[in-house]
């Protein structure tokens, strides 16, 4: 099992940053390995990604979501992965975004790559591209302010 924790400061208000992060279908615009994300309902996503030259598809469940605080998920099938994204208000115009993620490595090369920091570099790069994406726009492309607890929409 490999784990990654990376953070970045985004020069936008917390609600703008959070709202943009909830636009999961926009992820391919800043996540290098992600080819497509389809939101099938309020708590389920279908992912397609290419990692290390290998194509992966899986379904994930949003297990927890609280506006301007956290989005957590877990894979329902395919290669195991889970994690959460935390949003912390620094001041009126800046937000700290932290990604915490765990995933199962497959084979010696993935395990070695993980151990050598390739996962951290990937997440750090994706966060940097997210920062550029939202800061250059100055506004979110949309937003979902609902709440999820234990995989169920509660609000």
Regions found by a protein language model. Name each.
Residues 3-7, 44, 57, 70, ...:
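Intrinsic-disorder/low-complexity, polar/charged segments enriched in Ser/Thr/Lys/Arg/Asp/Glu/Gln
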Residues 1, 53-55, 78-80:
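Glycine-centered tight beta-turn/hairpin loop motif at sheet-sheet or coil-to-beta transitions
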Residues 39-46, 65-73:
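Short, hydrophobic/aromatic-rich segments at coil-to-beta transitions
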Residues 63-64, 72-132, 136, 141-145, ...:
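Beta-strand/loop substructures that line and gate deep hydrophobic ligand-binding cavities in soluble
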Residues 32-34, 60, 85:
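Small-residue-enriched segments and motifs
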Residues 52-59, 105-108:
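Short, cysteine-centered beta-strand-loop-beta hairpins and adjacent loop/turn segments enriched
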Residues 1-44, 129-138, 151-155:
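Hydrophobic ligand-binding cavity/cleft-lining segments
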């Amino acid at each position: 099992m490999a784990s990654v924790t990376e953070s970045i400061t985004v020069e936008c208000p917390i609600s703008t940053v959070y709202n943009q992060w909830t636009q999961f279908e926009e992820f391919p615009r800043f996540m290098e390995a992600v080819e497509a994300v389809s939101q099938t309902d309020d708590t389920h996503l279908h992912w397609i990604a290419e990692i290390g030259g290998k194509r992966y598809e899986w379904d994930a469940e949003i297990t927890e979501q609280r506006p301007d605080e956290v989005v957590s998920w877990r894979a329902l099938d395919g290669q195991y992965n889970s994690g959460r994204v935390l949003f912390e208000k620094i001041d009126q115009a800046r937000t700290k975004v932290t990604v915490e993620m765990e995933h199962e490595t497959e084979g010696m090369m993935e395990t070695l790559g993980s151990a050598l920091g390739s996962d951290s570099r990937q997440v750090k790069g994706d966060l940097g591209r997210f920062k550029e994406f939202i800061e250059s726009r100055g506004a979110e492309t949309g937003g979902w302010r609902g709440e999820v607890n234990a995989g169920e929409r509660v609000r």
